[in-house]
Amino acid sequence: MKGSRALLLVALTLFCICRMATGEDNDEFFMDFLQTLLVGTPEELYEGTLGKYNVNEDAKAAMTELKSCIDGLQPMHKAELVKLLVQVLGSQDGA
């Protein structure tokens, strides 16, 4: 549990840093980031969502560890997170 909290803190910190550093739609960035964490690969994070940032090796290692934790979730739990993401994305489209 302690490791999970640390990984969540890393993800939130990364999100906050990127959110402050960009002028793009922050919600869109965050949703793309979450979607890639749930169903993408670490490489897709660096090439896509985080592509315009210089991600150092320690941050890459942290992201890989976070992705590994997400990939280790029970399939039904991961599916529920994906459904929640789809629901949130759908509500943003209608707004």
Swiss-Prot record:
Leader sequence residues: 1-23
PROSITE patterns: SCGB (PS51311)
Alphabetized UniProt keyword annotations: Secreted, Signal
GO cellular component terms attached to this protein's record: extracellular region
Keyword Signal attributed: yes
Pfam families: Uteroglobin
InterPro entries the UniProt entry points to: Secretoglobin (IPR016126), Secretoglobin_1C-like (IPR043215), Secretoglobin_sf (IPR035960)
Location in the cell: Secreted
Matches recorded under SUPFAM superfamilies: Uteroglobin-like
Major location (coarse): secreted
Top-level taxon: Eukaryota
PANTHER family membership: SECRETOGLOBIN FAMILY 1 MEMBER, SECRETOGLOBIN FAMILY 1C MEMBER 1-RELATED
Similarity-based family: Belongs to the secretoglobin family.
Descriptive protein name: Secretoglobin family 1C member 1
Organism taxonomic ancestry: Eukaryota, Metazoa, Chordata, Craniata, Vertebrata
Name of the gene this protein is made from: SCGB1C1
